């Protein structure tokens, strides 16, 4: 009987903090997204954006995954796409609920020209974090590559609702509308 209490104690000692950290993380994200919507200017919005990216890019319980994500992101920025793709895939296998693993792999798939696979990964991101303005922006870019301009506009309009000051959304929507209008002529 004492062993049961010991195991329960150890479980709550180690996993209780992780559960609490996850709740705190969600509350913090909710507050940041509210601030982002209400931000008064671009520089304030950008500071909030950086805080959100920091939370997204940090795995809530596994520092090694956070480091792996950072390493694979560095590889991706160096053009080592296949290598970064494999690391992002491993991260997803280990932590399928972590939206940023999916988001980074969607990005590398986009860079590899594998647009439909990128869209599939973006869908996975949005299942886990519907406010992921990075994934929505990426979705817009993929739709542009696929010449699905109406869908791209919808993606950027969704971004604008979440992050009104994000310049890519503000710039892309009128450009895409003009492109659609010009193609209709």
Set out the residue ranges of the language-model regions.
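Positively charged n-region of N-terminal signal peptides that target proteins for export
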Residues: 1-4
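Bacterial N-terminal signal peptides
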Residues: 7-14
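N-terminal leader/linker segments that initiate helical-solenoid repeat arrays
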Residues: 18-70
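TPR/TPR-like (Sel1-like) alpha-helical repeat modules
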Residues: 34-40, 144-168, 174-178
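Boundary/linker segments of alpha-helical solenoid repeat arrays
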Residues: 43-46, 60, 133-134, 163-175, ...
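Register position in tetratricopeptide repeats
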Residues: 58, 77, 111, 145-146, ...
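Alpha-helical adaptor scaffolds
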Residues: 62-129, 134
């Amino acid at each position: 009987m004492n062993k049961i209490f010991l195991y329960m104690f150890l479980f709550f000692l180690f996993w209780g903090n992780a559960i609490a950290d996850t709740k705190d993380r969600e509350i913090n994200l909710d507050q940041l997204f509210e601030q982002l919507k209400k931000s008064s200017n671009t520089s304030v919005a950008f500071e909030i954006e950086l805080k959100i990216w920091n939370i997204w890019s940090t795995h809530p319980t596994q520092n090694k995954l956070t480091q792996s994500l950072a390493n694979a992101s560095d590889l991706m920025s160096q053009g080592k796409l296949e290598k970064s793709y494999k690391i992002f895939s491993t991260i997803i296998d280990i932590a399928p609920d972590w939206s940023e693993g999916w988001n980074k792999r969607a990005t590398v798939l986009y860079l590899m020209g594998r647009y439909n696979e990128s869209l599939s990964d973006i869908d996975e991101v949005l299942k886990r974090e519907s406010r992921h303005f990075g994934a929505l922006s990426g979705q817009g870019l993929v739709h542009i590559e696929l010449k699905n301009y109406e869908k791209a506009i919808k993606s950027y309009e969704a971004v604008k609702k979440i992050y009104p000051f994000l310049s890519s959304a503000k710039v892309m929507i009128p450009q895409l509308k003009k492109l659609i209008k010009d193609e209709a002529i």
